[in-house]
Amino acid sequence: MMRVRHLCLHGSVFSVDVRLLQVDGRWLASADAPDGPSLGLGRLPEEALIEALEPFAGIIDELMESVPDEFYWARAGR
């Protein structure tokens, strides 16, 4: 069974709705960007999220800081 995880990442000015899905050992992320959905793919969920957040260059780190604690990988190595 596939489970889509919905997240709302917060920046100082606005928030971004994203979805994460694991498919065949890879992660797919979709972020609601101003020009439509932005997709990211990665071996790790963090990689997929960062790629999907590319339209928000300059505040990606700030948005990633708001990833809920249940996603421990977002804090690893930082």
Where are these regions (language model features)?
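N-terminal segment of the canonical double-stranded RNA-binding domain
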Residues: 1-30, 36
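Negatively charged, low-complexity tracts enriched in Asp/Glu with abundant Ser/Thr
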Residues: 1-13, 65-78
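A short, exposed loop/beta-hairpin motif centered on an aromatic-Gly-Thr core
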Residues: 32-51
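Short arginine-rich
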Residues: 53-66
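Intrinsically disordered, low-complexity regions of eukaryotic proteins
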Residues: 19, 34, 63, 71-72
